[in-house]
Amino acid sequence: MKYYIPTKVYQEIDAVKVHAEELAGYGSYALIVTGKYSARANGALADVEAALDAYGKKHVQYDGIEENPSVETVMKATEFGKRNGVDFVIAIGGGSPMDAAKAIAIMLANPEKDAEYLYESAAHTKALPVVTIPTTCGTGSEVTGVAVLTVHAKRTKA
């Protein structure tokens, strides 16, 4: 078995501002995925929006990610992203927004698939670009290709 997960990690003060050009280079319209409050309260959302605005990139926020994100939430966010025509995804927050963003990126790149694709398929090879802006430490979601989601229909996580 072989894995290739191209990941860049920047750990520095004002990393979003310092790397704004790279952040803006992933597409023309970003879906910013967050929880309800913290990304706005801690200033991370404002930093990301300013970086995208500086390079003329459009962006829209989906702030409905709950703790232990569900497949249902991912599908709602996917529909929101489709309606807006986004072409890359940015997650701001802890493991929940980051995991949700990865799943949303998979579903946006595979519009013909339904929710079961997220937990019935062994591997996903197609996704929109994802940028993660972690605001907590400990989950490691920013450096993996894995997303943990709650599957209410099966009363489990996948």
Positions of predicted regions on the chain:
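Short Gly/Thr/Asp-enriched flexible loops that form oxyanion-binding sites at enzyme active sites
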Residues: 47-48, 76-78, 97-110, 143-144
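Hydrophobic/aromatic beta-strand patches that form the interior of the parallel beta-sheet core
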Residues: 60, 90, 129-133
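ATP/NTP phosphate-donor binding region
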Residues: 1-88
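A glycine/threonine-rich phosphate-anchoring loop and its flanking beta-alpha core
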Residues: 7, 109-158
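Glycine/serine-rich anion-binding loops at beta->alpha junctions
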Residues: 86-104, 135-141
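Gly/Ser/Thr-rich helix-start
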Residues: 13, 36, 94-96, 139-141, ...
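Short secondary-structure transition/capping segments
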Residues: 80-85, 105-117
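Low-complexity, flexible helical/coil segments
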Residues: 66-72, 93-99, 124-130
